[in-house]
Design a protein with these regions (language model features):
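Terminal amphipathic alpha-helical/low-complexity segments used for targeting or macromolecular assembly
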Residues: 1-53
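Flexible, glycine/small-residue-enriched loop-and-beta-strand segment within the central core
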Residues: 37, 60-70, 75-109
Length: 109
């Protein structure tokens, strides 16, 4: 498997725009009442896949959320961090503890 390195000095305009969009979605999600349609809609927009009956407790930080796939009946507790340039998959029936950091990218030296 090739190692994916992130070099922010060479980011494309599309990558920058997606980063801004993800940051804004995270901010809005972190300030939205949970268990509402608006909250659920923001979660669906932020992640690549978000399974049925799964819950995300805020606050959270998500970078490149479209690379994150969450299975069914997953609970992610508060203060989670997803840095997902290399992709992150959480399968069905998983509990992610509070303050968990899921990181699949590397930075250029």
């Amino acid at each position: 498997m090739d190692e994916l390195r992130i070099d922010l000095r060479n980011a494309t305009s599309e990558e920058i725009a997606q980063g801004v969009k993800d940051a804004q979605l995270c901010f809005k999600l972190n300030h939205t009442m949970p268990y509402t349609d608006e909250y659920d809609d923001l979660v669906q927009k932020l992640f690549g896949e978000f399974g049925e009956s799964s819950r995300l407790m805020t606050p959270t930080t998500v970078v490149r959320g479209k690379n994150v796939k969450i299975g069914k009946r997953v609970v992610i507790m508060n203060n989670s961090l997803f840095m997902s340039a290399g992709g992150i998959t959480i399968e069905d029936d998983v509990l992610v503890a509070a303050n968990a950091q899921l990181i699949s990218n590397n930075h250029a030296p």
